[in-house]
Amino acid sequence: VKTLPSLDPGFIPFGVWPKAYLKDADRPFKIAVERDHGKITVYETRLRGEAFAAANIRFAERRVKMLLWSAGGFRIYLQGDDTIAAQIRDAYRPGGAREFDAGFEFDMFERPLEVIICSEDDFPTANALPIRVGGHTNGCRIGFDAGGSDRNVSAVIAGKTVYSEEVVWHPKTSADPQYQFDGSVTAFKTAASKMPRVDGIGVSSAGTFVGNAPMVSSLFIKVPRERREEVKTIYDRAAKEIGDVPIVVANDGDVTALAGYMSLGTGCGM
């Protein structure tokens, strides 16, 4: 660190610390996270020697947490240091330091988070299973953006917007998911009325999704857990109010990335 902060001289930005840590790290350590449909993300890194035990667990635990939150999953595989792996496994157990993280992933995938200590032979291979979704410009389509303070809907014919509206709503304060459902249906029907037919619906929404189901979303933060099933099916049910219309729901960040791809004609843009 070139410049020490005067109010907290001991503070080290975490982006700087791993770079210094890895300079003398030479022991391979692998992390994999498994999520729905057998998708597996693998991250390979290195650890220092046993003399740096505290630094090793700090580095490895941060890498596991990063991978879990960036990829999501219900199963973590660790290989390379059984002692470090056991400490991480304990952290994700009930009462452990990462109990919150484990609970979040349970809400996402509805199964307890597992941490598995592997041998090199047992460690899984990466399985990205990429899918092509969205980007359609043909036909008559509805685009819906479910935001936390307003909702936006557009009617699009052959790639051209023929109608668009923005309506203020307050889903974050509603404990009854009927409010979010009714607002979505109203938006769909308004856009549908501007076109001769509806060939498909695309939804951009805050939250994390498995398929079209919002598993964790701030839009439903006040909805009690016992009404969770209503939330999970909310967009599919709303689409059925329009007819037998295909619908795809995605996180708003993923939709923004798709829009960037469509504008630039290439992926991996920042």
Q: Residues of each region from the PLM?
A:
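Short amphipathic alpha-helices and their capping/turn segments at secondary-structure boundaries
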Residues: 138-143, 181-198
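N-terminal accessory interaction module
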Residues: 1-127
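Glycine-rich phosphate-binding loop and adjoining helix at the ATP-binding site
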Residues: 49-61, 65-71, 87-118, 166-182, ...
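Short loop/turn motifs enriched for small/polar and acidic residues
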Residues: 79-81, 204-208
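Gly/Thr-rich phosphate-binding beta-strand-loop-beta motif of the actin/hexokinase/Hsp70
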Residues: 128-162, 269-270
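Short glycine-rich, Thr/Ser-proximal phosphate-binding strand/loop in the N-terminal lobe
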Residues: 19-21, 28-51, 146-186, 217-221
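Short glycine-aspartate micro-motif
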Residues: 75-77, 132, 139-145, 198-202, ...
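Flexible, charged surface loops at secondary-structure boundaries
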Residues: 22-25, 66-73, 135-137, 193-196, ...
